[in-house]
Amino acid sequence: MANQLDASVKDDLKTQFVTREGTYRLLTLSEYSRPNRVGYSSNQSSPQVRVSMVTLPSPAQGKLGSDVGVGTPVGGGTAGANTTTTNGSSPGASPTGAAGASTAISNGGAGGDYSHSNHNSNSAGNNTVEARLGGGISMHSMMNGGVVDQNGVATNQVLGGDRICFNFGRDLYVYSFRGAKKGTEMSKPIDKKFYKGTNPSCHDFNISSATPTGAPLLVGFTTGQIQLVSPHVGPREVRKLFNEERLIDKTKVTCLKWLPNSPHLFLAAHASGHLYLYNEELPCAATAPSYQPFKLGDGYTILTSKSKTTRNPLFKWVFSTDNCCVNEFCFSPCGSHLAVVSQDGFLRVFHYDTMELLGIARSYFGGFLCVCWSPDGKYIVVGGEDDLVTVWSLHERRVVARGQGHRSWVSVVAFDPYTTSYTNWDGGDFSDDENQMNEYSHSREARFSGDSTANGGFEGFDRNSTPVHADRNGPHSASFRSDASSAEKLMSYRLGSVSQDTQICLWDITEDVLRHPLVLRQPANSERAYLNGGVDEEAEAEDGIKVIRPVAMSGQATGQQAESGSCSPTREAAGGGTGNGAGEHSNSSSSKFSTANCTISSQSSPDDCDTEAATPASTSSNAGAGSVAGAGAVASTKQNNRNHGTGNSIKFPNCISATKSDSIDGGGGSGSGQRPSQTTSGYNSKTSNSSNKSSNSGSGFSAFNSLTQRLSNFSFLSSSEKKGAGYEGSHSTAHRQHRKAMSMLKSYNQHNHTGGHNNHSQSNNSSSSNFGHSSTLDSNAAGAIGSSSTAHSFGSLKLSRSSHHSSLATAAHASGSAAGSGSGVSSFDPMQLIGTPACPRFDECPLLEPLVCKKIAHERLTALIFREDCFLTACQDGFIYTWARPGHATHATQHLSPGQAAAPGGTVI
């Protein structure tokens, strides 16, 4: 929370910070808040401050001679056709498209209060909305009710540009966003609304229906209503209210999103855990709607209205887990996938058109609060009450990494699409160290100036540093650093997260972590294990590499290592089992890798690149390029004539560490007919002794000694299960050649519970017992109504457990016979998901550290939006801050001094 204190964290606010691309600076002239700013006022009980932005088309692109507002349907048939084209043959789009094409809305809204027939009925409807919401006092009349020109447009109206909308308490403000180049006119908001009876909780602009005069704005309220405000020429704006009588849902609206490229469809989430699909052209039912099942899936049900006439809501999504308050949902960049996070701690990923559940992920503990997609749609990042940032792969259907840096709940996660790059790093190691940052500040500003690309300003920079958007005069990221002058280029994702601890964290996540089979840094015969990025002098002399936290340096990269080290699932899938040559290279050379904020390593194998986990059979050859061996317990099973590849050995004994598996010492003699290092198990006795010593040396290795890390050492299995796992792993050596999954290292507490084993190799083998047997749901686990052949299957999710556990298929089949809608509830049992790809243990997947972690506000942060020239953050006290990117701070001299508070007041205890 915002009042959480940590003696190791400085309490002063940062007005600038340095990253690899340069210095980000706070612009006080581009700060947004209430026009009549007063002193600090607590907003703890009010809804979270949200920020929405939209870019309007220029007046030359729009048609200003029309009298029709954006929210008014222009040609019902066209609207219906557009909706159907956007969503394909979506069940959610088909009835809506038909209604949009055939229904004439003359009595729209709830109770017939709204009409598109004439202006008077619009005014009457607006009065009803104001009565329902306690007045809804608006400045729209003042801003748009002045003198009009020959086109009927107000002369004082701002056309085109960007709009920013934010809520604070019971107020809703809309400003013209001027970016980092111009200051804010706080006294001239485009629109201001004050609601007496309820508080706005979320909002969203419709980009597809935007005109130079504005864009339709959806506003959700704490009492459950949804308001649509459409720009309209004249003194009155068009307003419509959905769920007016609260007959559909009485709980708070937690998230609102327009469907991608749809002018009329939007999705609303409520605190009740339900999702509703609306068409803004259709009225709501005058009575409480009744539903009938439309589609049943594993853990979810989709209902549709029984009404003979098409009315809102069109569909209702119900999830069958307890405490399933939907906190946020997000559509993929392509618009075909939907990611939903809820208070029960689950991430659910759907194919929206077919309403199929593609995959799930479980939080380490607590609920998930926020979600976002990577710009290329390959990864989903979620944040929640476990203080972690979790990265989930769409192609592999598993958690591929976690990030630890926040000390409280993560409020917002967002990708920065403007700093994703292919590059190498030739500068120093900033690693959030301000003493080293100043040394590069002036030189980096010159390198990363706004016109550096156009003027050839990268002469001193690495020739291999080529941004993805070469024609963009923006900042560049250098995430894959190498003091060994590695020529290999990797894609780096820049991720930002803000939290209730008032800090912002920036992460550089490279594909060598997300896709590459992790490779050991130390030699095969070494007895040392690096814990938390520690530096070993002798290892440095042997490898010529120094480990620096939070950034690991890469080693010497040869042509063979580039070939064997780069993850190429497509090549492996095409080659089948003819990868012995590559396997020998991978097994003989422990190629090094570097990430911007992760200190991890393990032994690679060509089998590690051979997974097509969770990709459909029809797309496995293409989607295989994004799939690698899981960091969880994934088995090698044949399903739909696909070979799911094996995992590698990733060990994290204490937060962040680098160890090796005993398969290295075994050479390649694990079977003449199999690939070398086909089976990887736990620690050998040498590394086990080393890790045990390090565990006794204290718990201060982690830079972030939070409750999350402390709880990570606790096992979630019963003592009998631990004992069974220990004896099975110690004495059942016959299964070793059949285990092609990643060997998993349990926490030190579990090593103690496996007691009686004085031989470290036995205890470590027990800790990495048969996690290779996958358990998938039976193909008949889903309900019979409307469910397709893939809606049920968690085989693609590969929710595997150790062999001493009952499979999820058995549990689902046993519990699913009682009720069709709850057939997959057992699949969402948190205890059964722990240790699976959906929820790997804390020491079973790569753990990232932030590139930058700075305290930037007095109150908890609630919003983060990246723009091309800046990024914006919002905090609960109603301030929206603009941070200029390197080379874009034109009025940087106006920023606050370090001793001056950025916002009035202080941290509330």
Curated annotation (Swiss-Prot):
Positions with biased composition (Low complexity): 80-107, 115-127, 612-628, 673-699
Compositional bias per record (Polar residues), positions renumbered to this chain: 555-569, 595-606
Gene3D superfamilies: YVTN repeat-like/Quinoprotein amine dehydrogenase
Sequence segments annotated as region (Disordered): 58-132, 458-483, 554-628, 661-699, 720-739, 749-775
Assembly and interaction partners: Component of the Usp12-46 deubiquitylase complex consisting of Usp12-46, Wdr20 and Uaf1; regulatory subunit that, together with Uaf1, stabilizes Usp12-46. The Usp12-46 deubiquitylase complex associates with arr/arrow; the interaction leads to deubiquitination and stabilization of arr/arrow.
Presence of the UniProt keyword Acetylation in the record: no
GO biological process, one term: positive regulation of canonical Wnt signaling pathway
WD-type repeats, residues: 248-288, 321-362, 363-402, 470-517, 856-893
MF annotations from Gene Ontology: deubiquitinase activator activity
UniProt entry tagged with the keyword Cell membrane: no
GO cellular component: peptidase complex
Phenotype on disruption: Viable but sterile with reduced lifespan. Severe defects in adult intestinal epithelium; increased number of intestinal stem and progenitor cells in the adult midgut.
InterPro entries (UniProt xref): WD40/YVTN_repeat-like_dom_sf, WD40_repeat_dom_sf, WD40_rpt, WD_repeat_creC_regulators
Protein known as: WD repeat-containing protein 20 homolog
SMART domains, per the entry: WD40
UniProtKB keywords: Repeat, WD repeat
